[in-house]
Amino acid sequence: SNSYNVICHQTKTAPEIHKQIIDTRYQWSAFVHGSGTGGTIEGVRRYIDANNLRTKVCLVQPAEENHGIQGIGDGKDFLFNPDNAHKIIQIKTEDAIFKAKSFAKETGILVGISSGANLLAAERLVEAISPSGIVVTMLCDRGERYMSVY
């Protein structure tokens, strides 16, 4: 676990997301992301906290103990403490795979299984809370790694 990972997302990724949202004149309602090493979600969380934003940080985790969503939910907290999440959204492996496949068909963008999980979790959050602002997630892996699964 590289602490510079957190710093990069706190000082580069999160400010860029925030700037893009400010330009739309909407609020940043939530950031939805799985945790591998935890650098992305922890860096974004720190930025949100430091800037007193009302943005909810939502952690995506596999629903099963023995899952196939590579890159997230391996049981180690690394750089992100799950207690810092406002909400935990559990996604089944088969649903993450289905979402990644359907996203590729709809957009032509081939993403991996953890990106499918992030997308589905963000959609479920929107359905559950109907936020007035923007819900952000990231597509953090490439689909060509999973061609045998697709």
Regions found by a protein language model. Name each.
Residues 1-3, 111-113, 119-134:
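Structural signature of the thiamine diphosphate
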Residues 1-35, 95-109:
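Active-site/ligand-binding-proximal alpha/beta "capping" segment
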Residues 1-4, 35-39, 61-66, 92-93, ...:
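Glycine-rich beta-alpha junction loops
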Residues 27-34, 55-63, 134-140:
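Beta-strand segments within the central parallel beta-sheet cores of soluble alpha/beta enzyme folds
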Residues 34-45, 114-122:
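Short glycine/serine/threonine-rich phosphate/pyrophosphate-binding segments
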